[in-house]
Every structure is written in C-alpha cells, then in structure tokens.
C-alpha cells in the first residue's frame, strides 16, 4: 500500500508530493531524476483521480508516455512525463509518474480524456507490452499486425517460429 508520509525522513519530497499529501492523494515519492524532475509512484486504481488533480494543478502538457518490463515474470511499468506550460516561464515545472501493474492483468485507466496526446502513446504501450488502458477510445494494435500473438517487448516474450538469419555473404 502506498502511504504518503510514512517514514518521510528517509524520502526527500518535492513540491508536488507535498501538494498531493496536503490534499490527501495517495502516492509514493521515488526521488528525483538526474535533471531534478520529481518522480512519483501512483497505484493504478488511484491514477485517474490523481491525473485530474495534476491537470488542475497546471500540468497541461503530456510530454511523453512509455512503458517497460521491469523484470522477466515481474511487473510492468507505465511512465508519464508531464510539463506545466505557462507564459513567461524559463524553466517549466515537470513531473514523472510511474505506475506498476501485474503482468497477469495489466490494467491502467487511460488519460486520453484529459490529455489527447496520450492516444498513440498508450496504444503503443498496449501493442508492445499488453498494458490495457481502460476507457481508451481506440485501444488496438498500432505497430504490429492484428493477428500478432503476444507482446514483443516483454522480457519473457518468445518469438513464434523464430529462426536466425545467416549473413548472405
């Protein structure tokens, strides 16, 4: 379970983490990346309400969304990078959100209805890793053929009928 301020002396919390805690929104601070961008972990079931709160807070631009396989047989992660775009600001505020889900039933609420730019990005994560983004209007394969079996970027994926190509010369 994610608790906000349990043992807060061991975690450095950024401005957004403090704001979320003040509004009693569940999250876990994961520190900062090398550029000083705050990273937060959010549970899948809390994601939609937190996403709306982020938009209200001012994060009006979804810069990127990607997903990765944490470990063979382990969790899958969906990562969102948001930016707060404002006039006359040299250094816009940024945030990174990570959502970890089970590979057996990987479901995360879609944020398409908040940030339209999530459309193709969530579809790519679905196509490559099998993460289902609930309430996405067009969640279907975007890179692989509709007949493709499995999720090619999972670490435990085995290519069907794979054979090694030899050098032609």
UniProtKB/Swiss-Prot annotation:
SUPFAM superfamilies: Nqo5-like (SSF143243). It is an enzyme of class 7 (translocase). Keywords: Chloroplast, Membrane, NAD, NADP, Plastid, Plastoquinone, Quinone, Thylakoid, Translocase, Transport. Pfam families: Complex1_30kDa. It is found in: Plastid, Chloroplast thylakoid membrane. GO terms for molecular function: NADH dehydrogenase (ubiquinone) activity; quinone binding. It is a peripheral membrane protein. GO terms for biological process: photosynthesis, light reaction. It comes from the Eukaryota. The keyword Acetylation does not apply. Gene3D superfamilies: NADH:ubiquinone oxidoreductase, 30kDa subunit. It catalyses: a plastoquinone + NADH + (n+1) H(+)(in) = a plastoquinol + NAD(+) + n H(+)(out); a plastoquinone + NADPH + (n+1) H(+)(in) = a plastoquinol + NADP(+) + n H(+)(out). Its EC number is 7.1.1.-. GO terms for cellular component: chloroplast thylakoid membrane. Belongs to the complex I 30 kDa subunit family. NDH shuttles electrons from NAD(P)H:plastoquinone, via FMN and iron-sulfur (Fe-S) centers, to quinones in the photosynthetic chain and possibly in a chloroplast respiratory chain. The immediate electron acceptor for the enzyme in this species is believed to be plastoquinone. Couples the redox reaction to proton translocation, and thus conserves the redox energy in a proton gradient. HAMAP family: NDH1_NuoC. NDH is composed of at least 16 different subunits, 5 of which are encoded in the nucleus. This is NAD(P)H-quinone oxidoreductase subunit J, chloroplastic. It comes from Physcomitrium patens.
């Amino acid at each position: 379970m994610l608790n906000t301020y349990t043992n807060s002396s061991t975690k450095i919390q950024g401005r957004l983490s403090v704001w979320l805690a003040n509004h009693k929104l569940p999250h876990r601070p994961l520190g900062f990346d090398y550029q000083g961008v705050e990273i937060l972990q959010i549970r899948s079931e809390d994601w939609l309400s937190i996403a709306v709160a982020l938009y209200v807070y001012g994060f009006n631009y979804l810069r990127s969304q990607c997903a990765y396989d944490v470990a063979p047989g382990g969790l899958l992660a969906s990562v969102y990078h948001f930016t707060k775009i404002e006039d006359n600001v040299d250094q816009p505020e940024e945030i990174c959100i990570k959502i970890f889900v089970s590979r057996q039933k990987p479901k995360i609420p879609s944020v398409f209805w908040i940030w339209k730019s999530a459309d193709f990005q969530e579809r790519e994560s679905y196509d490559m890793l099998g993460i289902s983004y609930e309430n996405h209007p067009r969640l279907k394969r975007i890179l692989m053929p509709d007949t493709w079996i499995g999720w090619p970027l999972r670490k435990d994926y085995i290519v069907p009928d794979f054979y090694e190509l030899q050098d032609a010369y």
